[in-house]
Amino acid sequence: AWSPEHSRPAYSDPFELFADAADIIRAEAAELARLGCTYIQIDSPDFGTLVDPENRALREGLGISTERTLTEGVDIINSVADVPGVTFGLHICKGNYESKWIATGGYEFTAGKVFSRSTNFDVFLLEYDDERSGSFEPLAEVPDDKVVVLGLVSSKLPEIEPADELIARIDEAARYVGKER
């Protein structure tokens, strides 16, 4: 992670660090493809935490622009997924370390830019395991050629949600993106 205190001597602009990290990840993805890997999932909690105004303010206070993250940052991540022969998934979560989350809010704030700019990704894996995830309406912004994986089962609870509740949530999501996707 970029830190104004520790990173500035090497990276005056946080997006320079992000671009260098993406170069490393892209090289690793190419090597995995060369070895026969056909699916790579990139975890991008930054996009998930931007749904929360408090997290946006925190990042802005560190000098990491929300607007640049949703444009240049998405483009940087998208460049990682430009390896032929590999299906790429983009996992957008809101944090889950030791069953603790770090952001609350729906995807309305980020959906338009993240989904439309992530052209090299084939699959979006989205956290929807409780009410703080917001409505399914932002799924309407997922391009037609993309697959959506709904994270409906919570890893934060000791018990699995009842099947009828999960089916009802799938049916609700299907109002915005077809079940076949």
What positions do the PLM features span?
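Domain-level signal for soluble alpha/beta catalytic cores
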Residues: 1-181
